[in-house]
Amino acid sequence: MTETPDLDPEDRKIVTLARSARARNGVPEGAAVRDETGRTYVAGTVALDSLRLSALRTAVAMAVASGAKSLEAAAVVTEAEAASEEDRAAVRDLGGPGTPVLVAGPDGAVRATVSAGCPRSYACLSG
């Protein structure tokens, strides 16, 4: 279960969905995004010989392909310490620079929240 104090229930939901995608598919990362209508899109890392996408970029692509106009929030469950610049850029492209990106460990605990517009991995971290 995703247990992070002071986490909004809707944010807790996307962290839980991201964690489930990671575990269910046995991939390095799971991600989920929530669009402007509250719909969620969940994905895992794509690692094919001809196509490589992070879980977060895949979730953003799924949102775009489904007609989302904006994002309210994004979450990634990973062993990495921060969301990559490329991942934040994808979130920023659809949601804008103020869109929060929650970074959680494999246990589901949110380690940090960073703005999609943050210029560097650690510059705008909180949590």
Give the location of each predicted region.
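Short glycine/serine/threonine-rich phosphate/pyrophosphate-binding segments
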Residues: 41, 56, 84
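Residue-level detector of alpha-helical recognition elements and their boundaries
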Residues: 33, 52-53, 74, 106
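Short, glycine-rich nucleotide/cofactor-binding loops
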Residues: 45-52, 80
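C-terminal binding/interaction regions
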Residues: 2-24, 66-127
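N-terminal first-folded block
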Residues: 9-44, 48
